């Protein structure tokens, strides 16, 4: 058979993109690297999410630093998306789309207005870091970035080109270029709000039971969700017998009873899992959740961007879809079209979100204002807004157990209008929302699914 390699270029009203397609005799090929160089004009300004981990072990939760392109050096890795403003005012977002069976793209600079591509290598061997149940050490890495099919299309390299910042928010080129859905059976997929337990550390009060990870507390969450028309509640870390034993709940939790109780009130349950144990028995674990009547999973702490991890995301999307389960990828890289191919994939974190108000001052209104023009351009973003208690910069303090947000309550409400996520969290305690009924009523009524996007 004739061997072919082609470069496909496309131009759109909202940008330009290219990808490679191969038709090779070998069923499997090794990709040593992919060369990407972008030469930009002097004076371009960037919002640069600098990745300091040189092994690409990252949650993709950086601050977007405002830099001149000429200040970038080889050791300053940045992950996508990257926002660039030219001296003439054109706004460009650098992204990729249709990322499957291939590592994520990172960029570096050279102090000469050139951006160059880098990729995480194939991970041959890894292990858990001593003393942790989730952080990995990469023990052996290949000299290549992928082993893949000889006949295939590679990811799109995308420049989203916009006349102004308004057009940046409306640009959906990444979604346009992504592969179509693998299924037409989507009626069961229900976007919605989700009441979250972790941010508030289950601090409910004024109740006649002991608050904690137990059936009564989650019934309280279900009652709150039902009252405000919130479709789901999330049982985050702590519900299972162990972080690596995610096939059974702790004795204090009666999952079948919670599913029954929620079903009567039109509230579904979503369960948190670490990625590692899920990876080791994906089908078996999801079979259990399907049998229990669970509506979705939040998969957490992937922290990698290599080929194996990209394939893990797709495996989860497919296995969950086969069992009519929704998926929220937390501790993740950015979306690049997976949610189009598997429409049960509802949202991705890959952002420095509200959860870090528990340990940092970096999550402030300026940071939040940058996100719609940077991270959110890639796709749905699990920022987890909804703080009831708020403070200005002068009065803000860090409190992990009783967290507050930096900014106003009106700012928190506005995030529900601006931020896109098909599973949009209400991060705070139901008890706090009951004390702020106007706020709870307003944010719970803002839709999460749209037919058109306007800025």
Question: Where do the protein language model's features map onto the residues?
Answer:
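Short loop/turn motifs at secondary-structure junctions
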Residues: 3, 228-230, 292-293
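Short, small-residue-biased leader/transition segments that mark boundaries at the very start
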Residues: 3-8, 452-455
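Short, well-ordered beta-strand segments enriched in hydrophobic/aromatic residues
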Residues: 18-22
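Conserved structural scaffold segments of CAZyme catalytic domains across common CAZy folds
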Residues: 24, 38-264
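Aromatic- and carboxylate-enriched substrate-binding clefts and catalytic-loop regions
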Residues: 236-408
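Glycan-recognition and catalytic regions of carbohydrate-active enzymes
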Residues: 428-454
